[in-house]
């Protein structure tokens, strides 16, 4: 079971080091850090457990809590890749972010997925909804074995990358590796998105994504307990709150 923990969200713990990793990606953040009340200390005595303590000013209602990890909401996806032994394979992940045509995912260095992606340099990010939760969990718990046939997942190889595109996942990103940075047992995989695929009912007549129709599951929790969270039907267009505030100010 420990292997499942390392796959499903396990790499989110390392994102505190991404400021350093971005330097390898030729991006540097030059703006000074904002000042905060109190003092932030990182304590890591033996590397086995990291603790953070925030010494707040008097009257601050927040309190520090000790935990080995904190996942504040990451979309779950099924990572598809070619496998030298099994032909095609999948595993479950939750550590990713995307900017423009770039995608960064985190995978444990000792995992089969990391070895295979290093070899083939290509993969797919298959994003399920709540209808595929059983298969999603099974893909995470089973380790170093063939999983696509075992789980009964229908797929087709991508024409661009030959990585598996899962039929049951409404949204898929087809990706090619640009570079891999390994740190503290984690492979941070920087990739270019070659293609974005979505089921037809998620696109309008002009080919625009219907944001209110897609509801991926999110991974959330701490060292004590991890859970899945789901989206509801509420949406607000980007910038709508500023527009409302301006209208309110204009009336006053």
Listing of model-derived features with the role each one plays in the protein:
Residues 3, 9-10, 24, 38, ...:
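Residue-identity detector for glycine
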Residues 4-5, 13-15, 42:
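Intrinsic-disorder-associated, low-complexity terminal segments enriched in Asp/Asn/His/Tyr and depleted
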Residues 6-7, 32, 43-45:
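Short linear segments in intrinsically disordered or otherwise low-structure-confidence regions
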């Amino acid at each position: 079971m420990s292997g499942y923990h390392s796959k499903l969200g396990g790499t989110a713990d390392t994102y505190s080091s991404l400021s350093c990793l971005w330097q390898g990606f030729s991006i540097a953040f030059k703006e000074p850090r904002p000042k905060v009340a109190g003092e932030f200390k990182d304590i890591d005595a033996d590397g086995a457990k990291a603790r953070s303590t925030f010494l707040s000013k008097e009257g601050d209602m927040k309190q520090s809590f000790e935990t080995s990890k904190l996942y504040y909401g990451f979309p779950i996806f099924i990572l598809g890749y070619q496998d030298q032994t099994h032909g095609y394979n999948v595993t479950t992940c939750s550590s990713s972010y995307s900017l423009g045509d770039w995608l960064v995912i985190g995978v444990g260095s000792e995992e089969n997925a990391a070895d295979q992606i290093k070899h083939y340099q290509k993969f797919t990010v298959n994003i399920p909804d709540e209808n595929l939760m059983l298969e999603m969990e099974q893909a995470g718990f089973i380790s170093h074995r063939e999983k696509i046939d075992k789980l009964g997942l229908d797929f087709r190889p991508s024409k661009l990358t030959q990585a598996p595109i899962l039929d049951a996942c409404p949204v898929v990103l087809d990706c090619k590796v640009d570079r891999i940075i390994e740190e503290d047992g984690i492979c941070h995989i920087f990739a270019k998105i070659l293609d974005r695929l979505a089921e037809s009912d998620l696109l309008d007549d002009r080919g625009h994504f219907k944001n209110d129709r897609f509801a991926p599951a999110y991974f959330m929790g701490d060292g004590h307990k991890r859970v899945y969270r789901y989206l509801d039907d509420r949406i607000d267009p980007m910038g709508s709150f500023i527009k409302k505030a301006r209208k309110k100010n204009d009336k006053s």
